[in-house]
Amino acid sequence: MNLINNANKKLFEKINNLKNYSCQVKFSDAIEIEINDFDDNIIDLAKDLKPWRKGPFKLNATLIDSEWQSFIKFNGLKPFLNLKDKIVADVGCNNGYYMFKMLELEPKSIVGFDPSVLSFLQFSFINHFVKSNIKFELLGVQDLPNYNIKFDTILCLGVLYHRSDPIKTLKELKSSLNKGGEVFIDTMFIQRDDEFVLSPKSTYSKIPNIYFIPSIKALRNWCERAKFKTFDILSIKNTDFNEQRKTQWIYGESLENFLDPNDPKLTIEGYPAPKRVYVRLS
């Protein structure tokens, strides 16, 4: 596997050289891992793997306090997830937090897709202790149609606005489903009643790779063009400082730095602040 640079190779070697610890795992809001014969080298390695965007994870008494309180999103989706004996994909899976949480729902298999090497390293580190059969592919959503299996359920959370051709992305998700399958997406949207799409000039919330933020009507149109037959809105919520915030486990800025300090209803660029819609497609 090409891990791109020597620093990543060294981290991968450190993960592979970890002892085969005996562990107990609890899937609460944090993925809690109680490690027998725990030593400080484990925490040193976790710190070397910063920034931790998704989580949290707890290794004995040490909380990896991720930027995102990802259990908020998962707990909102969980009542709609019927995963028992299903073949599941998590597209844009980051470090696998949602995949680990889905284990308790007894899917047949889980495959994560994310081209980020750091995400793969974090996943490999956590999975060394969890010892799951989750598979992580260093691939993106564009690789799904040519993947060797189809899926009953696909999660694609926080990805669509990072794609320069969102309709193509939705088509790729649709083509990767088994018959009767479903896709769960969450995406930022603009609160308007018409068929409107915001295309930021250069950045949105200081993020350069956000291309299109639709109104819900425009999002529905995209999904219909991708040949989805059903469009079920599960929830709508604002992103707030409880869900996304700066911690000692990340570098740089977080949501509080991305919004207008004089008006938190606006981004630093003057666009409407992030709102998210959660949708089930089939």
From Swiss-Prot:
Gene3D superfamilies for this protein: Vaccinia Virus protein VP39
Gene Ontology MF terms: transferase activity, transferring alkyl or aryl (other than methyl) groups
Disulfide links within the chain: none
Keyword Lyase annotated: no
Enzyme Commission number(s) of this protein: 2.5.1.-
CDD domains referenced in this protein's UniProt entry, alphabetically: AdoMet_MTases
UniProt catalytic activity: carboxy-S-adenosyl-L-methionine + 5-hydroxyuridine(34) in tRNA = 5-carboxymethoxyuridine(34) in tRNA + S-adenosyl-L-homocysteine + H(+)
Keywords of this entry: Transferase, tRNA processing
GO biological process terms held by the UniProt record: tRNA wobble uridine modification
InterPro entries documented for this protein: CmoB, Mo5U34_MeTrfas-like, SAM-dependent_MTases_sf
Positions bound to carboxy-S-adenosyl-L-methionine: K54, W68, K73, G92, D114, P115, S116, Y161, R276
Subunit structure and binding partners: Homotetramer.
Family under the similarity heading: Belongs to the class I-like SAM-binding methyltransferase superfamily. CmoB family.
HAMAP family recorded: tRNA_carboxymethyltr_CmoB (MF_01590)
Cited function: Catalyzes carboxymethyl transfer from carboxy-S-adenosyl-L-methionine (Cx-SAM) to 5-hydroxyuridine (ho5U) to form 5-carboxymethoxyuridine (cmo5U) at position 34 in tRNAs.
Name by which UniProt lists this protein: tRNA U34 carboxymethyltransferase
Organism of provenance: Campylobacter fetus subsp. fetus (strain 82-40)
Lineage, top ranks: Bacteria, Pseudomonadati, Campylobacterota, Epsilonproteobacteria, Campylobacterales
